[in-house]
Design a protein with these regions (language model features):
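A common structural junction motif
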Residues: 27-32, 73-78, 85
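Short S/T/G/P-rich N-terminal loop/turn motif that feeds into the first structured element of a domain
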Residues: 1-52, 60-70, 93-96
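Charge-dense polyanion-binding interfaces
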Residues: 80-96
């Protein structure tokens, strides 16, 4: 199993934008077959060094992660939206 984590710092991190981004990220559930589990959390502390949203995706293998990265729904809907509303993102991928 592989865990894929992405943290996003939104250009405008008001409550509405955070909720909308969370909804877009969670919309992958059931639409991206290689994503076995998806969890999205919104930062509550709001410190200057905090990122606003964290996405966690669980996939079966490194090959499945590659398929996830290239999935049409992930690329055309989710990535497109998140790139439009984010000023920065970081990711971390590791085996379990």
């Amino acid at each position: 199993m592989i865990k894929h984590i992405v943290c996003f710092k939104l250009a405008d991190s008001n409550a509405h934008n955070c909720a909308q981004a969370k909804q877009v990220l969670e919309s992958m559930k059931g639409k991206v077959p290689t994503a076995k589990e998806i969890a999205v959390n919104i930062d509550e502390l709001k410190s200057p060094r905090s990122f606003d949203i964290m996405l966690e995706v669980l996939v079966d293998s490194w090959e499945a992660l590659e398929e996830y990265q290239n999935d049409p729904y992930h690329c055309n809907i989710v990535k497109k939206h998140m790139r439009a509303v984010s000023q920065q993102s970081i990711s971390l991928d590791f085996g379990l």
